[in-house]
Regions:
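Bacterial Sec-dependent N-terminal signal peptides
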Residues: 1-21
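Short, well-ordered alpha-helical
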Residues: 21-142, 173-175, 512-523
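Glycine-rich, small-residue loops and helix-cap segments
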Residues: 44, 117, 123, 158, ...
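Acyltransferase
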Residues: 45-48, 52-53, 101, 150, ...
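Short helix-loop capping/hinge segments that flank enzyme active sites or metal/cofactor-binding pockets
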Residues: 110, 115-141, 293-304, 353-410, ...
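Short glycine/serine-rich loop segments
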Residues: 148-150, 154-271, 463-483
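Short, solvent-exposed turn/loop segments enriched in Gly/Ser/Thr/Pro and often Arg
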Residues: 167-175, 341-344, 425-426
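A short helix-breaking turn/cap at a secondary-structure junction
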Residues: 234-321, 507-523
Length: 523
């Protein structure tokens, strides 16, 4: 308690009393938020090397080995790194140690930048000069190193961040959990019997395990929000164009962090127009550190039980109950809605066909002539329907999105609500190698699922001008976290951030007290 109060005083006042300086344990250093780290670095209490070494120790203890030979793990899927997190493709710890020493010099000479010395896990999708981006696929294991930086990587580097490792992804980013024949299964630090979400699952798991301080993600069907929810971290799917990404309107890059304040900091750094990306929005939106209280605001809450045959898991409903109560405690008016503008069931196929009829088609068309025996099992059905990915499919998906947009506007935002809160997925209890075999399933209220219908995220990629914050709200009975989506109106990022900020003050936060992963394995 004394240490917590002391840290708060450091961060708020900048007053340092050297006699009161506490020692930090390895775990405390590994899980320190970026905002706290920077304050303590500036004060000379700890150094970037202290945090880096603590996080490397976490990796060595909990991650397991790397598949450095890039061999096919298909027959070893369940045994490779069994009992470990397995969230890292490869590390760059030698370079990181040098960067940490350079950061310490900047703190000494007063030239430290906003993320000086803060460690970043990089999704195996973002270009980093000299790093390999193989998309988790055996087909691409011999890809040459990158010769340029993705814009968000460029911006993180320019603010002094230290890139420490590449995080695991499902093959070609096409799975809601994270496993591949190239890197194996990534498991949940809160409970290794369950999945971490996807496709930014390695980033989410690395944060939860204390391997890094912040991490990059991307989202074209829920790939930031699913890992955020299942790993108990914050994630943000910005509206299309807010962060320079690709020209695929379903997709966006975004931040993953353990705290709301770190989410604000990272998003403010990576947002804004960039000459490499003509769809990036101008001018840059600035994200303030503080937000107005929720008193008097009207917020819609949808439990989404009507979106899925049999409804959502009872613990997901319990999480929404907690959110509704927290909103009222914060002084907000709550509007419960029961509308269904989902993309579940048959409409999920329309969404997927629309997505794969964008620039994604070129990728899938190219691999149809590749060795399909090297592909993960879940990808093969997508390739058998390649002729169905065409302009007509894209138009059909667009029309479905326009109808959903009209419904959302009428029921939520035209009625005075500043945001909508809804679940991220129908259950937190999903097999870590979901869809690898008929046994790798999810069970919701006694019903078995192996489809993407358990996901409640894709509608906001179809409607990708809506910003969505995903924040953790409770631990389930099996200690797998449950998060919710906070959806602002089109391009109204700050409304979603305002609601997340308000809830973060009244809902007990992860990575405080006894709310840390214990790396159990319990079904």
């Amino acid at each position: 308690m004394k240490k917590t109060i002391w840290m708060a005083l450091i961060m708020l006042s900048g007053v340092i009393v050297s006699a009161a300086q506490p020692k930090f344990t390895q775990k405390e250093l590994a899980y320190l938020p970026a905002t706290a780290q920077v304050a303590l670095f500036k004060a000379g209490i700890i150094t970037p090397s202290d945090v880096l070494e603590a996080q490397i120790a976490q990796v060595q203890k909990y991650n397991g080995s790397y598949n450095t030979e890039l061999r096919d793990l298909g027959k070893e899927l369940n045994t490779f790194n069994a009992g470990k997190i397995n969230a890292i493709c490869f590390d760059r710890f030698a370079e990181a140690r040098k960067a940490a020493k350079a950061a310490e010099e900047r703190y000494r000479n007063g030239t430290a930048r906003r993320l000086e010395g803060v460690t970043v896990g990089v999704k195996n999708e973002n270009n980093v000069i000299g790093w390999r981006v193989d998309m988790g696929s055996l087909l691409l294991k011999d890809v040459p190193p990158c010769t340029d930086d993705t814009p968000i990587i460029e911006r993180l580097k320019n603010e002094g961040a230290i890139l420490v490792f590449s995080t695991t992804v499902p093959e070609l980013y096409v799975n809601c959990m994270t496993w591949s024949r190239l890197y194996g299964i990534t498991r949940n630090p809160w409970n290794l019997a369950y999945g971490v979400g996807g496709s930014s699952g390695g980033s989410g798991a690395a944060l939860a395990a204390g391997f890094c301080t912040i991490a990059t993600g991307s989202d074209m069907g829920g790939s930031i929000r699913l890992p955020a929810s299942m790993n108990g971290v914050y994630g943000f799917k910005p509206p299309f164009g807010r962060v320079p990404t690709s020209e695929i309107s379903y997709e966006t890059l975004g931040p993953l962090t353990r705290t709301f304040d770190d989410l604000v900091l990272m998003q403010d750094i990576i947002a804004g127009p960039h000459p490499k990306n003509h769809s990036s929005l101008r001018p840059k939106l600035d994200y303030p550190e503080r937000y107005r209280p929720l008193k008097g605001a009207k917020v819609a809450v949808c439990y989404c039980n009507q979106w899925l045959d049999g409804g959502c898991d009872k613990e997901v409903n319990e999480a929404l109950d907690k959110v509704a109560a927290a909103l009222k405690k914060a002084g907000a008016e709550v509007k419960i809605i029961k509308s269904d503008w989902s993309v579940q069931n048959g409409e999920m196929k329309t969404f997927v066909a629309g997505l794969l009829s964008t620039e994604m088609y070129e990728l899938f068309d190219a691999i149809t002539s590749a060795n399909k025996n090297l592909l993960c099992a879940n990808l093969v059905p997508l390739l058998t329907n390649i002729s169905g990915y065409n302009p007509k499919a894209l138009i059909k998906a667009t029309q479905m999105g326009m109808a959903a947009h009209a419904d959302v506007q009428k029921e939520i935002f035209e009625d005075g609500c500043i945001a909508l809160i809804m679940p991220t997925l129908a259950t937190p209890f999903v097999a870590p190698a979901y869809q690898a075999t008929p046994e790798d399933i999810a069970v919701v209220n006694g019903k078995s699922f192996i489809s993407n219908d358990i996901l409640l995220t894709p509608v906001w990629n179809l409607l990708n001008r809506y910003p969505v914050v995903d924040m953790p709200v409770m631990l389930s009975s099996k200690r797998v976290p449950i998060g919710v989506q906070i959806v602002g109106n089109t391009f109204d990022d700050l409304a979603a951030f305002r609601v997340a900020a308000g809830l973060s003050k009244v809902i007990p936060q992860m990575y405080t007290g006894d709310r840390f992963p214990d790396f159990r394995e319990q079904k």
